[in-house]
Amino acid sequence: MSKMDARVVRDLSESKKRVMSNVVQHLQQRHEKKSAKRWPYGVLAMILSVCIGLFIYQQYNEQQQQASTIPPVLDERILELYLQLDSFMNGKNRLYKASFDNFLYFESTFAYAQSKKLVPTQEQIDKALKQFMEEWSYEDDTRPTYDKLLQMLQVTNEGFIENFGKPIAYKMATFDLLWEASQADYKDVSSPIRTWLVEQEAMNYLEQHYHKDIASLREKYKIPEKDSQMKLIRSGTVLAIKEHEFLVVSGVLASEVGQKSVDELVQKHSNGTWFPLVDIPQTLSVGDRVEVQYRQSIGNDDAQPFIDYKDIVEMKIIKESH
Amino acid sequence: MLLIHELERIMEQHTERLIRLAFYYVRDLQSAEDIVQDVYIKFYDNQQNYEERGELKAYLSKLVSNRSKDYLRSWTYRKIQVQQKIFPQQTVMRRDMLVQQDERTLIENAILALPFKQREVIIHFYFEEMPVIDIAELLTIPESTVKTRLRRGRELLKLQLQHVEWEVLLHE
């Protein structure tokens, strides 16, 4: 059964139990102190990578420097595009906070890649531009058609390519290079988790270097600074731990761990979530009962309908396996 | 001030319906669960925004509807969409996929495949059983727009469901 099949919502008794139990746990644990500052290792790793990157890519860069105009970081033209796409959805001239956050993520990966002196070739930029323009030929019911968009932006096809297509393509090509480079940093890591780890590094970089510019854009577009995203909770048993990720399955009995395979337990309990392995207790072991706070899903696996990937805010061990 | 055990009673009554509603928006069960969890916590934290005289069912539906739209605009959703286009996953053929789909599944999957704007009004009209005027208020669009989207949605469904006798389509 694929994820997008109505049969997955036939019997929601397990889903209901999970949601109710997570909400109650969350509310009951409000008083607990927030965890220590996150991402210290990530930041150190980032600084180290940047230092090494600076040396290596300086020479590489000289050979690859292009005549193309390098678009600015936090390019407002892209925000204008988001604004039009949002207007299509909400019928008002209002930018969603979620879109502003998207913009920051997009710009952060570009700024971070630039800091690593990753410069795309003209061929890579052209390929990205072709890909970006092809995107508009796909049907997507959450956005206007290409022609409608041109009307909304009041530009011609050529104007759109020049003002939006090319700067975005340059950035897409740049962060393609960043993803490629990240494969060396995060070997044997699932794609959603690796992407999330790199995004965290990139966002930290952007916030450190462009703090004032971000604040000014927030003010201009009336975007609330407060993070409206709630912290959600997933409780369950750790069934697998890898170098950069760990798997939590809800509803598993202690007696089942080790008796059945991980796949069997995921199928039996119809859930399984991989989280990034960051800032977690060193004693974490398979069989531990844990509670993980997260903000959102970061990917799924169509080949395994019950498996998904989520980000992480913090986690704690409720009961150790032995 | 609502107490946790009172919230539990509310969740007992509304959770499955709200997960289903979120699913029809975002078309992914795990994300639908997250959205409903998020909505309950927001509801608990912002009780002052809920007027007792209003209908709780409609209020919770509105929160789920808005949160689902936020999700559809999120970086994560867009990224997953792009990943799926660029790296199409190999689909494992499972035994239950080979089973003939019943009529109800065919109808629901046809609705899931509708464009967003038509899908949204169809969900509220047929599954949430909301009158047009309430849908218009919920989505902050004119009643005439709701009716147009319903009509277009039904036309698209008729094309998809030519061999299925769904009374909704027969009587329209």
Which residues fall in each region the model found?
Chain B
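A short, charge-rich alpha-helical start-of-domain segment used by transcription regulators
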Residues: 1-20, 36, 44
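Short, aromatic/basic-enriched loop-to-helix "N-cap" motif that marks the start
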Residues: 48-62, 77-80, 143
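A short pre-motif secondary-structure segment
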Residues: 121-125
